[in-house]
């Protein structure tokens, strides 16, 4: 009969290995967290090198945390200790006492008594470890008496369910939407880019990208010739180009397509011209099924003319916001297909990091929160500033990424604080360059939807800039603690969005998936400014 372990025991010299081998083993994952020596991990079983029970229960009390993008996101940085089982040892001992009683009943010489004793056994709880006393008593005893499935079948079934759960967990939306391959449509989807972003009204159109080659999106026909307007299933408008004088909307509503009696072309005020064009837009239908897509990657603080856009003018939104119709962030983390491969981006050894804090800023404005916080932080720790304006110095010839890689920390300070507004300052300048980002933007919870919580430092975590400076100096003196901010690289890699090719292809992908569902944006400004 299998030996039951009741009272707590200590290792009996060199014989504890034999006792451990004879004891019923728990399933993988039922126990974890090897932290310290000399404590029993379970009543009746002495486990050398396991954590003490106070630490065990303290870690067990930590709530599980998850991330999301568009509601979900990357999994948080693994802390190095797996979750502990939530039951204390006293409760486990109380669960063993009925087991002893049931086994004594099974020794009855009467078959009927034995059957009643078998029926009185507690039912194994769903999800209980297969090697637990409940499973051993219920599952194995039933097999020996010809009741139930063979033990090998049970083990194989449990292994199959475990593999299925792990695959589902790994594949379920832990990251913002990635450019997965789309089914090839019956006919290519045409997407017309009305203005070249930041290129000016008279700039030559760029060659369209190959969506299949670059982003694994097939069935796209990217258009730049406005003569193909009637063939496009979607037309992409960049918001910044809407504010450059009277907008030349597509026909039949374009201002230049009407006489001066209909629209006064002398009016150069953007809001009045846009309102006039939108009034014309309601007079004639668009091509059937065509979607107008509003595209913007600036924050509401730097997006003029939002409130001048009439209701129902656009059908979709494309932006960094996770609740956009077409969500295209500045960057994201994706699971590494081969964990043994070197991490993406730059990760120079600590011996090559000669500086402490770096900051690259292109637009210096004393009114911005990031500049005010810099002045406070620079009083307690040295910050090397690169870029135009303020105390900035030119970026060295080796380039921005290699310059930042020489520093331990990078100030990923956004020019304004809005929902989901997390730009290349985090993804490219810090994470890809191999520096720990110190972020100032939306709150920490917003960042944790897209980035592991142990991959960055938020200014809101500290009551003052001096406290943050003290913590940065502490990490500088403790390399082992500093390296923890790079543990996420073992599981994830950084993707930097390719502007403007990737948004173009992502609109094509969205059209393929949307079907014929109609939609229009009733109040664009109220949605984007919240």
Curated annotation (Swiss-Prot):
Organism in which the protein naturally occurs: Homo sapiens (Human)
Keyword RNA-binding annotated: no
Lumenal compartment segments: 173-530
Gene Ontology process terms (BP): carbohydrate metabolic process; fucosylation; glycosphingolipid biosynthetic process; inflammatory response; L-fucose catabolic process; Lewis x epitope biosynthetic process; lymphocyte migration into lymph node; oligosaccharide biosynthetic process
Keywords (A to Z) from UniProt: Glycoprotein, Glycosyltransferase, Golgi apparatus, Inflammatory response, Membrane, Signal-anchor, Transferase, Transmembrane, Transmembrane helix
Residue span of region Disordered: 1-48, 66-112
Protein name: Alpha-(1,3)-fucosyltransferase 4
EC number: 2.4.1.152
Keyword rRNA processing belongs to the record: no
InterPro entries associated with the record: Glyco_tran_10_C (IPR055270), Glyco_tran_10_N (IPR031481), Glyco_trans_10 (IPR001503), GT10-like_C_sf (IPR038577)
Pfam families: Glyco_tran_10_N (PF17039), Glyco_transf_10 (PF00852)
Lineage, uppermost ranks: Eukaryota, Metazoa, Chordata, Craniata, Vertebrata
Cytoplasmic-facing ranges: 1-147
Bias type Basic and acidic residues, positions: 88-106
């Amino acid at each position: 009969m299998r030996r039951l372990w009741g009272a707590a025991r200590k290792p009996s010299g060199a014989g504890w290995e034999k006792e451990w081998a004879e004891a019923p083993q728990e399933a993988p994952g039922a126990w974890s967290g090897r932290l310290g020596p000399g404590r029993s991990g379970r009543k009746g079983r002495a486990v050398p090198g396991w954590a003490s029970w106070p630490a065990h229960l303290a870690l067990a009390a930590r709530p599980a945390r998850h991330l999301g993008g568009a509601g979900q996101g990357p999994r948080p940085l693994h802390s190095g200790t797996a979750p502990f089982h939530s039951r204390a040892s006293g409760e486990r001992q109380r669960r063993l006492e009925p087991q002893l009683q049931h086994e004594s009943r099974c020794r009855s010489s009467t078959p009927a008594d034995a059957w009643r004793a078998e029926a009185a056994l507690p039912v194994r709880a769903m999800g209980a470890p297969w090697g637990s006393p409940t499973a051993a008593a219920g599952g194995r005893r039933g097999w020996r008496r010809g009741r139930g499935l063979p033990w090998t079948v049970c083990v194989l079934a449990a292994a199959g369910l475990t593999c299925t759960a792990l695959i589902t967990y790994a594949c379920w939306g832990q990251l913002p939407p990635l450019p997965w391959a789309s089914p090839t449509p019956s006919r290519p989807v045409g997407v017309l880019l009305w203005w070249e972003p930041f290129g000016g009204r008279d700039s030559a159109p760029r060659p369209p990208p190959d969506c299949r080659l670059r982003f694994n999106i097939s069935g796209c026909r990217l258009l730049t010739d406005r003569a193909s307007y009637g063939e496009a299933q979607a037309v992409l408008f960049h918001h910044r180009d809407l504010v450059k004088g009277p907008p030349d909307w597509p026909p039949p509503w374009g201002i230049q397509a009407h006489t001066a009696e209909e629209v006064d072309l002398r009016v150069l005020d953007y809001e009045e011209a846009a309102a006039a064009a939108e009034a014309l837009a309601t007079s004639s239908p668009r091509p059937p099924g065509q979607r107008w897509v509003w595209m913007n990657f600036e924050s509401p603080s730097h997006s003029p003319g939002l409130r001048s856009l009439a209701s129902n003018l656009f059908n979709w939104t494309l932006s960094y916001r996770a609740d956009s119709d077409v969500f295209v962030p500045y960057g994201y983390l994706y699971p590494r297909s081969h964990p043994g491969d070197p991490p993406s981006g730059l990760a120079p050894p600590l011996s090559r990091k000669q500086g402490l804090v770096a900051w690259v800023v292109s637009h210096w404005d004393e009114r911005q929160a990031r500049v005010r916080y810099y002045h406070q932080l620079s009083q307690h720790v040295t910050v090397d500033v690169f870029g135009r304006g303020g105390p900035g110095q030119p970026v060295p010839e080796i380039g921005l990424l290699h310059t930042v890689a020489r520093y331990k920390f990078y100030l990923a300070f956004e020019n304004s604080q809005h929902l989901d507004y997390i730009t290349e300052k985090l993804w490219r300048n810090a994470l890809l360059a191999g520096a720990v980002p110190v972020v100032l933007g939306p709150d920490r919870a917003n960042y944790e939807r897209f980035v592991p919580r142990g991959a960055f430092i938020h200014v809101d975590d500290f009551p003052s800039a001096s406290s943050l400076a003290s913590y940065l100096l502490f990490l500088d003196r403790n390399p082992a603690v500093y390296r923890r901010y790079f543990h996420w690289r073992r599981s994830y890699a950084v993707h930097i969005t390719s502007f403007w090719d990737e948004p173009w292809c992502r609109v094509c992908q969205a059209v393929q998936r949307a079907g014929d569902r109609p939609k229009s944006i009733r109040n664009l400004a109220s949605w984007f400014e919240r």
